[in-house]
Amino acid sequence: MYDYIKGTLVKITAKHIVIETNGLGYIVTVANPYSFSDQMNQTIQVYLHQVIRDDAHLLFGFHTEDEKEVFLKLISVSGIGPTTALAIVAVDDNQGLVAAIDNSDIKYLMKFPKIGKKTAQQMVLDLAGKFAELPAETTNTTANQTAGNQQLDEAMEALLALGYKSTELKKVKAFFEDTNETAEQYIKSALKMLMK
């Protein structure tokens, strides 16, 4: 098991980042890869969780230990795998998640990709009262301003990778067409819209 990795950020894609350390490039799947845009070619530290399967060894990365803790609690719920947990972590609204779990708000929980009624109920059963020590937000990085349409396309790719449907994303993309923000800002805003 690994706690964290420290190395140079050398690549960002819609699904993951690549961190080079000691001559090896580690693929680390993260909730919002573009939140690392301002740290390209710099030394970064990312908290890790390793998943070992028969066909792959996967690394999931997080900005903070609190974000990792949310992820670990989510994957402890039957029916929630790492990809679904990342999609939930990506919303970056712990207060909404905690309130929904503590208040048994099944409808809110079902707005996350791949979360049906049964899984939402299981989340409430397994996690109610277990998030008391977590802060309101898990990440606090910002990205540099760049070309809007390319950034919007990258944000939509990342949301597709998290499991959102292209039909949902077309409506969201149309809303942002005339704006100029970073991919990270688009993702955060889009996730808030999708959760309404």
Swiss-Prot record:
Q: State any single GO MF term.
A: ATP binding
Region annotated Domain I, chain positions: 1-63
Where does it primarily localize? Answer: cytoplasm
Q: Which InterPro entries match?
A: DNA_helicase_Holl-junc_RuvA_I (IPR013849), Hlx-hairpin-Hlx_DNA-bd_motif (IPR003583), NA-bd_OB-fold (IPR012340), RuvA (IPR000085), RuvA_2-like (IPR010994), RuvA_C (IPR011114), RuvA_C_sf (IPR036267)
The segment annotated Flexible linker runs over 143-146
Localisation = Cytoplasm
Quote the SUPFAM superfamilies the UniProt record gives: DNA helicase RuvA subunit, C-terminal domain, Nucleic acid-binding proteins, RuvA domain 2-like
Protein family membership: Belongs to the RuvA family.
> What is the protein's known function?
The RuvA-RuvB-RuvC complex processes Holliday junction (HJ) DNA during genetic recombination and DNA repair, while the RuvA-RuvB complex plays an important role in the rescue of blocked DNA replication forks via replication fork reversal (RFR). RuvA specifically binds to HJ cruciform DNA, conferring on it an open structure. The RuvB hexamer acts as an ATP-dependent pump, pulling dsDNA into and through the RuvAB complex. HJ branch migration allows RuvC to scan DNA until it finds its consensus sequence, where it cleaves and resolves the cruciform DNA.
Name this polypeptide is given? Holliday junction branch migration complex subunit RuvA
